[in-house]
């Protein structure tokens, strides 16, 4: 499949997902700016989130299910009401996850240019995942994350404050990424 055909298909899928409300609104401006570059296209994205995940006894990612999630800072009382409503036996984890972008580049030169630009604003976690004849696939993530079993936390206030600051820093980085000429 040619780069042009690949990019057109990805843009059509993005447009359809956006119409259905399936695209994270906090990252739309960045994704659309990246997609304007003829040599880049977004594959998937998330602006970051605070969430409560339930796991089976083996705590495998493949068995994880969302119990609650917030794309941005969360109110402590709202969080605690949701947390204390949990009555299931599966273990619950509190997680703060940074933004994540999966981007395809037309070629290695375009991928290198993209990665150099994200490094200039302080994003450390990004690189090439796979290379194919017509494209280079990259993953980029923010730097801040937390993952703890919810039953190990005695006082939620300080942890929620830290999580909210992490989400604010995360959104600040996304705004810096939006200002880059892709």
Cite the ranges covered by each PLM segment:
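Helix N-cap motif at beta-to-alpha junctions
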Residues: 105-110
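Short, solvent-exposed beta-strand edge segments and adjacent coil->beta transition regions
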Residues: 98-100
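N-terminal, charge-rich interaction modules
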Residues: 1-86, 161-182
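Short, flexible, solvent-exposed loop/turn segments with mixed acidic/basic and small polar residues
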Residues: 84-95
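Structured core elements
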Residues: 102-104, 139
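Helix-rich interaction surfaces within compact, conserved domain-sized segments
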Residues: 117-182
């Amino acid at each position: 499949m040619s780069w042009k055909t690949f990019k057109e298909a990805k843009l059509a899928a993005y447009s359809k997902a956006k119409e259905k409300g399936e695209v994270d609104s906090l990252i739309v401006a960045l994704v659309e700016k990246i997609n304007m570059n003829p040599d880049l296209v977004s594959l998937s994205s998330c602006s970051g989130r605070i969430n409560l995940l339930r796991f089976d006894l083996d705590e495998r990612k493949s068995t994880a299910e969302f119990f609650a999630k917030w794309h941005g800072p969360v109110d402590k009382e709202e969080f605690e009401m949701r947390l204390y409503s949990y009555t299931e036996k599966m273990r619950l984890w509190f997680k703060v996850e940074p933004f994540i972008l999966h981007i395809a580049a037309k070629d290695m030169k375009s991928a290198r240019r993209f990665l150099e630009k994200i490094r200039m604003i302080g994003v450390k976690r990004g690189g090439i995942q796979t290379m194919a004849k017509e494209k280079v696939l990259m993953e980029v993530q923010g730097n801040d994350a937390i993952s703890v079993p919810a039953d190990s936390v005695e006082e939620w206030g300080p942890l929620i404050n830290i999580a909210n600051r992490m989400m604010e820093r995360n959104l600040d980085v996304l705004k810096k990424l939006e200002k880059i000429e892709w």
